[in-house]
């Protein structure tokens, strides 16, 4: 089962029983009216007894790409357009900022995986989890 959750500034994804096909790069994209930020982490799922995978998995902590405008190819055209600002703006909207990064995870098949990201910025912020450039859906 995959459970996606967003409570306030905390975005999370839980995989109840990880399978080898759950391994890969997971990306959290946080968006609001002012822009977007993203961060990613690597999930490794071992299905074989240790010894077969003698070399350590590649673990790279990726820093966020805060973007104004977003750097997402085709989507960027739509998100770059800004609404005309009112004559006296109340407060400038702050684009999302990742303040806590999801950590790389290494688990055995059948174990659970939880990834957390914490964001700051002007609400509402929507968080989307991606894997292989596809949005992850709950199951």
Swiss-Prot record:
An annotated Gene Ontology molecular function: actin binding
Enzyme class label: transferase
UniProt xrefs under Pfam families: I-set (PF07679)
Taxonomic superkingdom: Eukaryota
InterPro entries per UniProt: Ig-like_dom_sf, Ig-like_fold, Ig_I-set
Keyword entries, A-Z: Actin-binding, ATP-binding, Calmodulin-binding, Kinase, Nucleotide-binding, Serine/threonine-protein kinase, Transferase
TM regions (residue ranges): none
Alphabetized SUPFAM superfamilies for the sequence: Immunoglobulin
UniProt PTM comment: The C-terminus is deglutamylated by AGTPBP1/CCP1, AGBL1/CCP4 and AGBL4/CCP6, leading to the formation of Myosin light chain kinase, smooth muscle, deglutamylated form. The consequences of C-terminal deglutamylation are unknown.
Segments of this protein annotated with the region Disordered: 48-97
Protein name: Myosin light chain kinase, smooth muscle
Protein's gene: MYLK
